[in-house]
Curated annotation (Swiss-Prot):
Similarity comment: Belongs to the IF-3 family.
UniProt organism field: Shigella flexneri
UniProt xrefs under Gene3D superfamilies: Translation initiation factor 3 (IF-3), C-terminal domain (3.30.110.10), Translation initiation factor 3 (IF-3), N-terminal domain (3.10.20.80)
Main function: IF-3 binds to the 30S ribosomal subunit and shifts the equilibrium between 70S ribosomes and their 50S and 30S subunits in favor of the free subunits, thus enhancing the availability of 30S subunits on which protein synthesis initiation begins.
MF GO annotations: ribosome binding; translation initiation factor activity
Entry's localization field: Cytoplasm
Pfam family, one: IF3_N
Protein name, entry field: Translation initiation factor IF-3
Lineage: Bacteria, Pseudomonadati, Pseudomonadota, Gammaproteobacteria, Enterobacterales
PANTHER family with a match to the protein in the record: TRANSLATION INITIATION FACTOR IF-3, TRANSLATION INITIATION FACTOR IF-3, MITOCHONDRIAL
Annotated keywords: Cytoplasm, Initiation factor, Protein biosynthesis
Major location (coarse): cytoplasm
Length: 206
């Protein structure tokens, strides 16, 4: 490589020749504490284990360990810095590829758990025909399966106000059709303004 410089990467941790310390606090494969050792010793332990050494805390001057690093590279292992601000820096012998995979997987799991529940609305009328009803029902099923709440708004117009019972029957039908997927969070006891509103929440998975 031109000038003998190491290409900078977007890795979150320093590994091998990127580690800037003469001594490191070393952690083994099972998390066991191996004490404070020279970087050369740490790399040799990583090589013996056939894994990577990850630096966890880098805060020292750079050092030349060409021989040890070449040996580690030949064995296909790394020394990975985990805690760059500790004194001395904390490094770990590990399979760095697996470490990054598990970290990414954990981050994705956290994002799933942090899903923001939305309330999605579908509007009905007392005179909603069967075809339109089934289309709206499929949308409600999709909302609930995605983990969102469903707001069912039944609107009355003109003379429909004289047939509020029909509106209540529509809401009860929706509730019954979705009973396997949802629980009723709120159900109207009377009309408010010109509408009735029912809110369904997805059932918690067993």
């Amino acid at each position: 490589m031109k000038g003998g410089k190491r290409v900078q990467t977007a890795r979150p941790n320093r590994i091998n020749g990127e580690i800037r310390a003469q001594e490191v606090r070393l952690t083994g494969l099972e998390g066991e504490q191996l004490g404070i050792v020279s970087l050369r010793e740490a790399l040799e332990k990583a090589e013996e284990a056939g894994v990577d050494l990850v630096e966890i805390s880098p805060n020292a001057e750079p050092m030349s360990l060409r021989e040890a690093l070449e040996k580690a590279e030949e064995a296909g292992v790394d020394l990975v810095e985990i805690s760059p601000n500790a004194e001395p820096p904390v490094c770990r012998i590990m399979d760095y590829g697996k470490f990054l995979y598990e970290k990414s997987k954990s981050s994705k799991e956290q994002k799933k758990k942090q899903k923001v529940i939305q309330v999605k609305e579908i509007k009905f009328r007392p005179s909603t025909d069967e075809g339109d009803y089934q289309v709206k029902l499929r949308s409600l099923i999709r909302f609930l399966e995605e983990g969102d709440k469903a707001k069912i708004t039944l609107r009355f117009r003109g003379r429909e106000m004289a047939h509020q019972q029909i509106g209540m029957e529509v809401l009860n039908r929706v509730k019954d059709d979705l009973q396997e997927l949802a629980v009723v969070e709120s159900f109207p006891t009377k009309i408010e303004g010109r509408q009735m509103i029912m809110v369904l929440a997805p059932k918690k998975k067993q």
